[in-house]
Amino acid sequence: MKQFTYVITDEAGIHARPAGQLVKEAAKFTCSTTIAKGAKKGDLKRIFGVMALGVKNGEEITVTCEGADEDAAVAALESFFKANL
C-alpha cells in the first residue's frame, strides 16, 4: 500500500472537469485507488466517489493505492494533483 497527502490549491476545489480527468488518470491502473478527506472516503475510479467528498480549496486529501502497480499509480496521481489541483 502506498499513499500521499495533498492540499488542494485550485480555487474551485475538486470540481467536475478535473474530477473527470482524475478518474480517467486513476483508471489507467489496475490497483485499488481511494481518495479520503477526513473520515469520508471515495473510490478514485468513480466520478461520484470523488465528487461526493466535496473537496474545497485548502483542504487536505489522502490518496491510497494498493495493488500490483501501486508505485506507478501513486507517482502519476501525485503528479496529476500537483499539475491540476
Where are these regions (language model features)?
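Short amphipathic
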Residues: 1-8
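C-terminal structural segments of small proteins and small subunits
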Residues: 51-85
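Short non-domain terminal segments
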Residues: 2, 46, 78-79
